[in-house]
Amino acid sequence: MKIGCDLVSIARIEKIYQKHGEKFLDKFLDTDEQKLFKTSSSLAGLWAAKEAASKALGVGISLECSFFDIKISKDSKNAPKLDFSQKILKNFKVQTASLSISHDFGFAMAVVIVG
């Protein structure tokens, strides 16, 4: 098992979104993921989740793992769910993945465990 985590300032993500709008969203979220964006906190949580997932793989966001190789959705209980592209599943031999996202005191944090 490997663990990745990321902590991001919600204000920082909000500022980037205000400056770049949809272009910022299109850079790291697919159309389904963009529907999860309701507030600056949720947007920062999505950013942190993708960063944490890439760190759990040991490569960060890179040619080996792009933002679009990581898919965030919600499960039947509305908890965040993490899926990887077939490329990632094969190259990193991922069998399981767990994601937790939290927001508090102006920060969003995500923790990912892959096995």
Tell me what each language-model feature is.
Residues 1-115:
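Core catalytic alpha/beta fold that binds nucleotide/phospho-ligands
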